[in-house]
Every structure is written in C-alpha cells, then in structure tokens.
Amino acid sequence: MDGPPSPTRVPPSYTDGPPSYVDTPIADEDTMSVPGNNSSLRLLPQGQDEYRSISPPNRVSPDRYHRPAASTAYSSRPGSSLGRAPSIPLSSSNPRSPIRPSTPSRVSTDWTRPPAPSVAYEPPDINGSPRPGTPSSQYGGSPRRPLPPAPLFSAKGAAAETTIPMPEPESENDVFVDNYSIMPDNDPRASLKSAHSYTTDSTFTEDDDITNEKLNHYGPAPEGRQDRRGLREAQMTKKEVRLINGELILECKIPTILHSFLPRRDEREFTHMRYTAVTCDPDDFVVKGYKLRQNIGPTMRETELFICVTMYNEGEIEFTRTMHGIMRNIAHFCSRTRSRTWGKDGWQKIVVCVIADGRQKVHPRTLNALAAMGVYQDGIAKNVVNQKEVTAHVYEYTTQVSLDETLKFKGAEKGIVPCQMIFCLKEKNKKKLNSHRWFFNAFGRALIPNVCILLDVGTKPDSKALYHLWKAFDQNSNVAGAAGEIKADKGKGWLGLLNPLVASQNFEYKISNILDKPLESVFGYITVLPGALSAYRYHALQNDPSGHGPLSQYFKGETLHGRDADVFTANMYLAEDRILCWELVAKRDEQWVLKFVKSAYGETDVPDTVPEFISQRRRWLNGAFFAAVYALVHFKQIWRTDHSLTRKILLHIEFIYQFISLLFTFFSLANFYLTFYFVAGSLADPTIDPFGHNIGKYIFVILRYVCVLLICLQFILSLGNRPQGAKKLFLSTMVTYSIIMAYTTFASVYIVIKQLTTHALEKTDPNNPYKLGNNIFTNLIVSSVSTIGLFFLMSFLYLDPWHMFTSSAQYFALLPSYICTLQVYAFCNTHDVTWGTKGDNVMHTDLGAAKAIGSGNTVEVEMPSEQLDIDSAYDVALRNLRDRVEVPKPPVSENQLQEDYYKSVRTYVVASYMVCNAILAMAVSEAYPVGSHIGSNFYLTFILWSVAALALFRAIGSSAFGVINIVSAIAEGRIQAKFERIFGGGDERGRHRAGLGSGFSESGKTGITSGSGMSGMSLSDVTSKISEKFSWMSGK
C-alpha cells in the first residue's frame, strides 16, 4: 500500500510541469492498445475525444449508485474533491458498467496526498481554447478527469460547502467493507432507488431482490438508421487558404490513430495527405501546371511501374481483395535485393492509381476503406474552385497499412511496405474509357512510367503476378503488351463450382488460357488483353507527332455522337481492351508484339446469375465480333510496320485462323441445329432405336419442334426484353437447351457403343468395322474423341487438368446456351452500345423558377402584370384556333438520329444472321433427310472434322509456346551462370567490372541499359542473338 510510487510518463508538451493526474500510473485496461509488430490493431477512442450521452436522460447506470458524488450544483461548485477520492470497487454481485476508455484509472492508495494545484500547466491552443484532453471549465475545473453528469436525484438547492467524508485508512469504517454507507447523514439528496424501478421510494439495499422486480417497458426500439453514439461529430470551420496557381491544393494531416501506429513518420508523404481539386480535362492536366508528389520536392522520383485500378460501385470486399494483392506484390518487388531496379526502396518506383467513376456512384464503404488507409478524407473536397467546376478530386498519400479481405489491418509486421497511392474521384460518371484517359493522358504524362498495369476492382493478383508481367517487358524490348492469366474464383473449398454458370465459365477460362492465348502469343498478336489483368509499355502507346496512334484510336470511342458514330466502331469499343491490341501490333514503322505470361495470374469474380451473365457476354461478344471484323478488313496495315518477313507471314496465318473461327461463330446457330438434327434423328431409325416401339422417333419429333420454337422465342425475348426483367424466361430457355444437349449426347454415346459392339450399321465391311474411312467410326468416333482428347492432353501437359473433371460436364451442358442464348441476344442488341449507366438527368429551366425570399415562406415568381396581358394571351389562343395556324415541327434531335441509325443497323445484322443460318439449316436438312446414313453425311463429317482440326491447330500452337518458354529459360539460365562465373558471381560489383551495367539482372526501362562496354544489352537480347534460328520467338 505504501510502496514507492510507479514512475510517471510525462508528455513532452508539458513545458511547465505535469498536471497532478499524470502522477497516476496508466492502467493497461484503460489505455489504447497500439501494438508494435502485431497483425491486429485495437482502434479505440483516445482520452481527448468528446462523447455524447450514450444512455437516455431518464436512465441511470446501476454503477452510478455506488460512486461518491458531490451534492453541489455544477454552476457554483469550485474545485472537485474527486482528486482525493478513492476508487471504490463494486461487489461481484452488483451489475457494473464497462470502463470508459476516456477515463484514466486511479490505482494509487495514497489518500493523504494534497489536493491538486489550481495552476494549469497545459498551454492553450492557437484559438485560446484548452487542448484536447485538457479538463475545461465546463466540467468544474478538475484536472483529474471530466466529471460525470450531475446525478438525476441530486437536490437543486445543495450547499456549496457540502462534501463527502473520507475516512482514514485505519478507520473502522473501511470503505472497502460491504456494509459501509457512502452517504452522509445530512445529504439533502433524495434517497437512492432501485436500479430497475423509478416509481418507488424504497432505498436500494442489499436485502432488495432486483431480479424479481417487474421491468418497465419504454416503448419499441427506434426504427430506421440511427446515428452512432459515443463518437464526436466533425466540427467544420472556415479557413482562408491560398490558391496555388489559381488551384486548390491542400496538405492535410492524417488521423491521429493512424499516425500513432505507423512505423515511419520521417517524411511528409507519410504524415500528410495531399488533396488537389482538378478543374480541367484530363488531356490538359500537365498543360495547366498540375503536379503530383512524384514531380515536386523531396518526393521527386522516377516511376518504373504505374498500376491502374478502375472501379464503379464495387464494395469494400472487392476493393480490399484487389488492393491487398497489389500491396503483397509491391512487397515482393522490395524483397528482390539483388536487383538493380528493385530492392529495399523499390516501392519508390511504383505508383498505384485508383480511379472511381463518379462521386455519386462510388460505394461508401469503399471510401471508408480508403480512409482507413489514410488515402481519403471526407469533408475537404469542393465542387467549385475559383468559379471553375471541379472535374476530379485527386488524393495522394503514401500508405503503410493494408486491409485484407476480412478488413483486418496488415502492416510492416506482415511484410507490407509503403505504397504511393493516387485516388482520383471523378465528379461525374463518364464510363471506363474516360477513367483510362485520366490514367494515361493525365497522370501518365506527369509520371512518364515505363510499364503500365491495368486491373479491375475484384481481381486478386497473385503475390508475384505483377513482377512476372513487368519481367516480360524487361526481357524483351519489343514487347508492347502482356496478358496475364485470369482464373475464375471458385469460392471456398471450390463450392462455387456447384453453380453450373460458374463451373462453365471456369472451364471456358481454362481452355482459353491453355489453347487460345499461348497460340496467339506464338504469332505475336493476342486478340484481347484482358482489362482485369494486363500491362502495356507506355512508350509504345504514345501517338506520333501528328496525333495519330494507339491512344488516339483507343479514346475515339468516348466521343462518338450522332450519325457520325459508326455502329461497328461503337460496338467495337464495348470490348475496349481489344482496341489497343490491334493498334499496337499494326503501328506504323514499329515492330511491337504482344505476349501471354502464364505465370502472372489473378482470380476474379465471374457472374453467378443469368441476367448478369447475359449482360456481360453481350458486350464481350459484340465487341469481339466487330473488333475481329475490323482487324481482318485492315490486315494490310501489317505491311506498313517494321516486322520481319517471318513475323508478317505468321500474322497472316493467324488472320486465316481467325477468319475461319469467325465463320463458325456466325453460323454456329445452324450448326448446332444440324448436329442435333442428324445425331438425335439417328435414333428414329427402328433398327437402332434404343427404346423400341418407335419411341425414339417420337422423342426426336417433339424435341425438334421444341428446338425450332425455342430459337424463335429466343429472338423475341432478345429483341424485346432485358435479362433483368425476364429472368425466368431466359433461365427456362437455358434449361430446355441443356435437356436437348443431354439427349444429343446420349444419342452420340449410344451410337458409338452400338458401332463398337455390333455390325448392324456397317454393311460394307463387316469383318473390319473399325477401319478408317467414310464410316461412322471415322466420322463420329475419331473426330469427337480427338477433340476431347486434345483438351485432356494439353491440360495434363500444363499440369492443370482439374477443370476437365470438375467443370467440363457443366460447360458442355450449357454449350447450346452459349450459342442460342448469348449469341442471339448479342446480335439482337447491337444497337445498345451503352454500359447501362446513362439516363435523362438533365434539368430543364425554360419555365423559370420560384425563388424563396426571407424566411422561406414566400417565393418570388414572374406573372403577367396587367389584365391586358392576360386578355392578349387569350386573344392569341382564339386566333390560332380560328386560323388553324400550322405548328412548326421540331427538328429531329441528334440522339434520335443516332438511335434510329443504330436500330436500322441492328435490323440488318439480325436479318442477315437469321436468314443465313436458316438457309444453311434448311438446305442441309433437305439434302440429308432424317434416317440417312450418318457415315455418308458429308456436312456432318465436315463439321466434326473441322472442329477437330481447329482443336489440333490450337494444340500445336500451345505446345510451341511451352517449348519456346523452356528453351528460353534454359538458354537464359546457362548464359547467366556463365557470366556469373566469369565476372565475379553475378554481384553488382562484378557486373560493373565487366561494363555490363544491369543487363543480367532486372535492367531498366526498355530492357537496354547504359553500361560502358556493351551498351547494357539485356539478357534477352543476348539470348536472342545466340538463338537466331528461333527468330520467330524474338521480337524481330
């Protein structure tokens, strides 16, 4: 009890001496926990926070009846005696309120200590008000702590000199004894009442059983959204801020709690958030003199990697999934300590730009996540600056914390390194193309990065995905774009595959990443670099001096209006990520190529409902179709490039492959019907009917009429209904198509088994039914098995075969829906070139306005002033009726012309699509009626073998991609090992002795560095020179 006092911690701001309450040691349970290297943080309010009352005014906590309280009124009370009051613990049987974090606990038992001095030690702030946390006069002037509110049962006329008797520690009436009464005999206050009753006059004693008392009902709980209690409301004040070059630029301190657990506070970029109100178009950002932190002061740095994250109205879970993945990738860059480009301070060469498309559209919880990281602060943005409308709000901050998907903080203790962030909050919703214009033309021109990476919110990149993308540019200076592998998010424990839509998309993504992307990468032209995970070389995107180039063509789709907006061009820009691909490869006098990087993968959410799935594929299919047509029509541009002859020949081979694929896509509706017609119709033959009694024929006739009617219904639905409004109808058609596909698959399997077990269908050579030739075994079995077998083979070669077992059945069941539902809906909505975000939000002001004056009860309006004006208007109305004055017709608006043009083109496209498929289906079905021999059906043979040939072509290209990667890896490893042995083990000093700069590590901006001996040739250039016989794998 009388041991030496604990040492006190005196803040440095107490220049004249500490106040009396600092002598009390701080209890662990009452202080805010700020761990140094723990993964979890307790963000508790500080002691200086002001709190609103968290309980109703007529309700008193039971704990308050056991507290000593003064009977004086607060208005006339001098100093509080609580500075010498003991902390009286409660009995374990009594209810107790939780300890308030804002109240320091007193654990000292020295009750004979003199009262607190009346001199205040803390200086006031610049406004003369007490500092936060300093007891002010409104609490009675006590330096101990803010006093609680006055007791509800205190008498109003209490004497000022009334105090509570405090016994000595040796007294027989110990305050820690249960039967000690803490109330004086002459206390004028009313007697204490039961904790659960406010109507009786009985004193609350130990004998009272409060558990059996009847509780009073205080009405129902409040409805609707309630303000959170216990938090201090933001107090806004007016300040004079000097404009910088006529623009509003603010340096705002970060929140105190965030500042308290930051590992680094030595630079202003860690302690202040920079806000800029941009009032110009993104193309004029640099011209108007706007600068980013990387362009000014001590934070002036070169940017090697510029990451763009675009979002619309996604929630905090999707945002944190993407952002935490980026933070893990930046940590991996910093872990590469042997690199000349990266290393410990590699984060200084990486800038992350988050662009939100519309201030009113962004999700509030996403803003909360950004605020928790210190990037965003509410209440400082303005709509108008210096009579100029703000177009974008730019927030800059170097954050040191990250939020994972579970919204838990991760800091330096988990390997998180600082991250330079730019948050661009666009004032209006202007679609994704405009967001990319802010990224490339505004911030890109200010930073001049080497590589730009594009991500969508919701995509979770692997911890090394961004490094592998960057490495593709570092190894080959001719690479202009790189595509990563997109994987479907299968959910926890792959439970998402129980949804057939998710499973079918998982299979589709896998086959594309195993067969299609590697094939196109070998040729050097990838038809689509996915916007969810792709990268571009910033220098390759730039326009020529005349203003013509990839970016100018890319952003053309943002300004298309009226009849000048070609419907083909408008639809092509729905899949905007396909535009840059063609423009880069076909750039005049250049030799840029595109590359697929399989090791750079990321997971993304896929649509799991029918309306969302159809709407997404409508944009993709239309954009892919019209972009492919555009590339095929303009293939001559390849001859104006600087590509080698071998590369040009390979590109033309790819164009032929794309043309064949485009034809199959256009006639896919007829091919599906004919395949069903011939295969399912074979069971109508009585000789092979599996059911007998002509049941196979009846089933075929029914399914045939259902299929035809369903296709007609699909056109009607697609022309007149949205998927969101006719969800059940679209779902019903997809289920029916799956039933038809299931019966067709059953017929194929039955025919194959029948062919392999009996000779009933093969009359030409009964001794050898398995020979190759024009028979069922060759045309049906070999072609089908070869197609599916190639899928299995390539999946096993890439060591990723699980989708064949978990998702292939769902994909083949939904394959008719891909053709008949998605393709038909896409062609029937070619006129719709919007993203579903437009609306008539223009306010018309031709009628004037009623302006409020005074207190708001009266308004000011314009009305006819004289009776003559009223009579004149009436006379005009009568004269117009009598003379039948012709009313001039308003001219057709620009929007109406555009809509009419788009709908007319839609009509031509749908009519051509429908008529061509109908003619093909009718002609072939008439040439080969039902019951004809499948082995002699030339068209079915052509279809089956064409599919097998295309699959084989894709498999050969995919295999070549794998072989090239293996050869490049072996050559690169051998050359690097050789130079490390010659030049001192490959360390930095050895490379400088050889005059190679950083060419045999991560080099620099273009894959070529400025060494002294060999002009800093990168490792890929040396490898390319040694392996000239593989010239088609290099960039030349």
Swiss-Prot record:
The EC number on file is 2.4.1.16
Class in the EC hierarchy, top level: transferase
Mutant lacking the gene: phenotype? Leads to strains that are hyperpigmented in rich media. Does not affect growth rate at both 25 and 37 degrees Celsius nor the virulence in a mouse model. Affects the separation of yeast cells with enriched chitin in septal regions and increases the frequency of enlarged cells with multiple nuclei. Leads to increased expression of CHS2 for compensation.
Name it.
Answer: Chitin synthase 1
Native organism: Exophiala dermatitidis (strain ATCC 34100 / CBS 525.76 / NIH/UT8656)
Instruction: Kindly give the membrane topology term recorded for this protein.
Output: Multi-pass membrane protein
Query: Which intervals of the chain form a coiled coil?
Result: none
Instruction: Provide the reaction this enzyme catalyses.
Output: [(1->4)-N-acetyl-beta-D-glucosaminyl](n) + UDP-N-acetyl-alpha-D-glucosamine = [(1->4)-N-acetyl-beta-D-glucosaminyl](n+1) + UDP + H(+)
Residue ranges under compositional bias (Pro residues)? 1-10
For this UniProt entry, the molecular function terms from Gene Ontology, in alphabetical order, are: chitin synthase activity
As for subcellular location, the record says: Cell membrane
GO BP term, example: chitin biosynthetic process
Q: Name one GO cellular component term.
A: plasma membrane
CDD domains the UniProt entry points to: Chitin_synth_C
Q: Where is this region: Disordered?
A: 1-153, 189-229, 994-1019
Q: Which UniProt keywords apply?
A: Cell membrane, Glycoprotein, Glycosyltransferase, Membrane, Transferase, Transmembrane, Transmembrane helix
Q: Which Pfam families match?
A: Chitin_synth_1 (PF01644), Chitin_synth_1N (PF08407), Glyco_trans_2_3 (PF13632)
Residue ranges, compositional bias (Polar residues): 194-203
Give me the glycosylation sites of this protein.
N38, N179
Q: So what does this one do?
A: Polymerizes chitin, a structural polymer of the cell wall and septum, by transferring the sugar moiety of UDP-GlcNAc to the non-reducing end of the growing chitin polymer. CHS1 mainly responsible for normal yeast cell reproductive growth.
Q: What induces it?
A: The expression levels changes little with temperature change, regardless of whether the exposure to the higher temperature is for 3 h or 24 h.
